[in-house]
Amino acid sequence: MSPLTSSLLLFSLLTSSLEAIPVLQPSFPPSSPSPAPSPGVRILRAPESIVAPLGDEVVFECETSLQPEGFEWSYRRWPNAANSNGSVGASRFKYLKSGNGKLNVTQETAISRLRVLVRPDTVGEYRCIGWFGPLVVTSTTARLELANTSVKGRQETHLQWRVAPGNSVLWSCGQQVHSNPSASWSYYRNGVEIKPELAATNGNLFLTNVSTASAGKYTCLATNPASGARIEISSSMVLEVLSGRGSQNKAPHLLSGQPTSQAVTIREGSTLLLLCPGVGSPTPTAVWSSPDVVEAIHNKRTRVLNHGLEISNVQGHDTGTYICYLDNGVRPTLEHFINVTVEVPPRITRPPWADLTNEGERMQLECEATGVPAPELYWLLNGESSINDTEAEQLPNGYLVLHSVQKRHAGYVQCFARNRLGEQSAGTLLQVNPKQIQSEPRETGSGGGFGSHRSMKPVNHGQKPTKMIPPSPPNVTRLSDESVMLRWHVPRNDGLLILFFKVQYRMISEGKRKNWQTTNDNIPYGKPKWNSELGKSFTASVTDLKPQRTYRFRILAVYSNNDNKESNTSAKFYLQPGAALEPMPVPELLEIEEYSETAVVLHWRLDSDADEHLITGYYAYYRPSSSAGEYYKATIEGAHARSFQIATLEAATIYEFKLQSFSAVSASEFSALKQGRTQRPRASTTEEPTIQGIGDRDTTSHNQPSHNETVSMSPMLTGTIGGGALLLILLVSAFLCMCRRRSPRGRGQTQNKPRMAELREDFVPLGSCSPNKQRQRTRHIHITLNPLAQQQQQQLDEKNPPGLETDNDMAYFQRQPTYEYDPGLRRMSSSSLRRSQRTLERAGGANSGGNNGGNNNNLNQSSEAGTADGPCMQSSSKPGRVIMKRPRLSSRSENLSSGSLNSVGV
């Protein structure tokens, strides 16, 4: 990736894409070291330094805890880029391009390998970079060095020593040799290789308890283990061992060429062998002590040898001066001083710690480390050196100061401690809350709808132009292989009201640019009320995504003027497959506390072995237990949270809840479901009103009565309402009484008058359902109240011969009457109807034997045709009207309808 592409990527971090971003007051890290915010990803195995000869091919390996979106490697020349003590120079790392014949980069899931051909122009420092969406995690530096062996100066030393038998002799053969890596040594006596009694002596040959058999000429040879190069040292030592008879008593003393003191440097964790040179007659004995190191001799790691002291697993506190006393009873004794320096790789004791920071604020990041030699600190901001950032300044104590935090600083900040033994790094998430950019006022005409962006000349009538404040860019968290969770917020403002939100996303690929996709769901804004001074926060999930793809997201806000405005896009998010992710700690719901009628409090905990550093916050899901719909969601920021209040619930309702933890990369499994309920509504208590005298009236209280208190009304208002109700009751009673008195007279006067409306009410139209839901015959009766209508009916029958369909609008079913007859009239009507029925039957019987002629009075046929299969008459054809002509009925039958019944249609 080119530096320009990297810069554009960093510039895309306009907000913290890792956390919710309300505006917070600046906070400072706690005085005691605490876990720094972690992105959930880290370098598991950093590349290691290699020493190799020219022409060799070496492999650097880098492994991350999660599979990154991509790996890259950077390089800079060495040793020009760093001093001999390992301090960092000013040269910059450059990104490498694979396939130029000198190097090759391969990737296998979360492991990247860099193959380098060792050449003079490839010697230097390498480090790998893992891209996790907006996060850039950089490994420590690995050094590629050339294997070499050289001799300091060409001064030859030929020593001749004469010693009494039983003494120990120390010969330093390799002090003039410099080798990278450390050389292996071979020793020869009279040209024959011998095996040294003590190994790892760094070119020092130590002969113990010499005898005449030890006499001879000694030489040595150095071999480079990496290149195999061998250097034969021209120096030599001739040893002569005296016989025991001719030796005289001598105090302990040094031989020619032996040092009076030594300086030993060793790496922590190695095995240290201290040798005490000196001979005497009789053979002296060595006694060890140290004025600087407590219990240097008497501990489990120390073993006293003949003229030697061995310390295993050397620690930093073993540094100091060691004194060897040689004593054989002849004065004076010999003192030999050895200064031991234990080198310790750098260790970061106080990692950086960053909190959510507003754009433009000043921030100081602290980092402290120990090591021998003292390590040098340097900083990387999303993989870029702080030296190249104009807003960054590194103080003499190693602290980093950002004078004005910018959006480009959002991401992963790493502190590196370095000395010649190696490097160590520690990092923290730096989250930047950007300044809200007020949008320019836009006028929308009457035709402006959703997505309208037409610009018009502003018309100012003395009012402030309305503004559309966009939502913040969404923070993205993985939920599953095919879904993510988005979190955004709207800062507190006095702009246009937002009606709802839409989520848009786009897949990023190397080919053709993909279009933005819009989800179908409308995310409601809710009540136009700010939850806090910080604004309102929202969450939404996006499903049907593809794993191992890179996406960008943005939020579209629709305002009350039917216009819309998009948020800034999120940083690139690489959707990891679940198999490649480190599992997140799963919270355990402990209790659902009934807090109020509309709120509950969730209480949870984490397992004792859970890594809290991986957690950024929690998602709470809840819904009524009687519902099978989607869950409502709430976001809980902070890994240390153990309780959370959920409000705006319904009273006396049982809900089910579940939790999951999340980080910038993934989310945990859901906790077990747990049910809880809100409190029942409190029963209101009513206080009986008390009558107070004028003197007892309280004139100092002006508070409004509470919701559970009864307000007493004034006596005048109470009397007015009571009197009106009583008057209304009297009027209704009088009206009902008058109606009942007039009813008998009216009934007697109107019982002999035509009651066409009442008769019509007794019949229902054909084709409709019978009120009593029973099968009835298809019988319709036409009652003519006018005696002269018989002739008109005959003329009508001639116009409509039998078989011709007639209008069915006037056809009715007869139903049970719903009014009460006068008893006398009921008896009279019943007898008249029976006579009429017998007359009709005789007339029908007389005509049944002959030809029907013009009359279709076949009653049996009509009855059969009128049989219905159900309560509703649904005949496919309209029934014809059957007219039966007969002589005039008796006078009694006239009372049937208070008139003449001239024709009956059946």
Curated annotation (Swiss-Prot):
Residue stretches making up the Fibronectin type-III domain: 470-578, 586-681
GO annotation (BP), single: segment specification
Membrane topology according to the record: Single-pass type I membrane protein
Compositional bias per record (Polar residues), positions renumbered to this chain: 427-439, 676-689, 701-713
A GO term from the CC aspect: plasma membrane
Alphabetized GO MF terms: coreceptor activity; hedgehog family protein binding; heparin binding; patched binding; protein homodimerization activity
Signal sequence, renumbered to the chain: 1-20
Name of the protein in question: Interference hedgehog
